[in-house]
């Protein structure tokens, strides 16, 4: 069962912190490994979003019954405005906050693609970033923590 939009909303965790996504959240880290190195497709959050102006991955609330990979791909479509057609599923990482989790789904694409000319309202800009440039960007704090845990920063 998947009720579209059913996961939208904040929840309060036992420690008093708030998280977006009543059933957790997920995002997709798109990776391309080529002769010129490893690249990641990132999105700069629009000023209409929490911590606007920072870089992260497309992602958001999971709907009731939605698997992390499905939610991550759906959010990519909503925020970037295009679908990922050719990819290989890589690792999936769960960041458990005690009753609420954020899932980072890593997928590999055979080639870098151009971002669409029109992006979703939550995204100010999207582009490919070389792995050695990740630490030079102003990253969304939780995304920075994830990259550190994954050994990418």
Q: Where are the predicted features?
A:
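N-terminal strand-loop-strand
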Residues: 2-56
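Unchanged
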Residues: 60-153
């Amino acid at each position: 069962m998947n009720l579209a939009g059913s996961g939208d909303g904040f929840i309060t965790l036992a420690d008093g912190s708030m998280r977006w996504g009543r059933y957790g959240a997920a995002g997709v880290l798109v990776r391309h490994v080529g002769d010129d190195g490893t690249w990641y497709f990132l999105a700069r959050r629009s000023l209409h979003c929490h911590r606007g102006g920072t870089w992260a991955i497309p992602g958001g609330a999971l709907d009731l019954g939605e698997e992390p990979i499905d939610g991550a791909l759906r959010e990519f479509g909503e925020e970037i405005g295009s679908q990922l057609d050719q990819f290989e599923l890589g690792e999936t990482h769960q960041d458990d906050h005690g009753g609420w989790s954020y899932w980072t789904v890593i997928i590999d694409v055979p080639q870098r693609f151009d971002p669409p000319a029109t992006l979703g309202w939550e995204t100010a800009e999207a582009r490919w970033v070389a792995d050695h440039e990740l630490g030079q960007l102003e990253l969304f704090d939780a995304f920075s923590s994830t990259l550190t845990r994954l050994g990418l920063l």
